[in-house]
């Protein structure tokens, strides 16, 4: 009988004071689609330039400028919600998976290296711009 009342007591306390839950921001599908488009465009340009014999720096700058030009003229209002770090992650994963082997980038180390390299060159190439703004 004691177990029953003790169980009932804890059940009532649980109902009166439920545990806190932490919710994540729900991602807007149109933001994800735009981010995918940007990432695909950058990766396609970068890998094409690498395969055409450009240096890493030349290919990076060229792909950034081409992608930035497309984004600048985009009227999609969702572009302001794209996080630069998320986009850099996605681009890094895609580049390493698509053509990273051709210049020695493989696995997580390759993705991390390319991400930091991308962000560094991006800041130098477009200091007053932001992919997503």
Task: Report the location of each language-model feature.
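Compact alpha-helical subdomains of small soluble proteins
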Residues: 62-133
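Hydrophobic helical h-region of N-terminal Sec-dependent signal peptides
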Residues: 6-15
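Immediate post-signal-peptide N-terminus of mature secreted/exported proteins
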Residues: 21-57
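Enrichment for repetitive, rod-forming helical segments
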Residues: 9-10, 42, 122
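Positively charged n-region of N-terminal signal peptides that target proteins for export
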Residues: 1-4
């Amino acid at each position: 009988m004691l177990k029953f009342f003790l169980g009932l007591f804890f059940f009532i306390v649980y109902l009166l004071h439920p545990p806190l839950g932490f919710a994540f921001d729900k991602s807007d599908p149109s933001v994800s689609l735009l981010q995918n488009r940007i990432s695909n465009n950058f990766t396609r340009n970068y890998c094409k330039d690498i395969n055409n014999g450009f240096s890493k720096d030349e290919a990076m700058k060229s792909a950034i400028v081409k992608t930035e030009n497309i984004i600048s003229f985009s009227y999609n209002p969702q572009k302001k919600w794209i996080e630069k770090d998320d986009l850099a992650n996605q681009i890094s994963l895609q580049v390493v998976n698509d053509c990273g082997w051709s210049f020695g980038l493989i696995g997580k180390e390759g993705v991390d290296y390319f991400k930091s390299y991308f962000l560094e060159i991006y800041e130098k190439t477009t200091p007053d711009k932001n992919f997503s703004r």
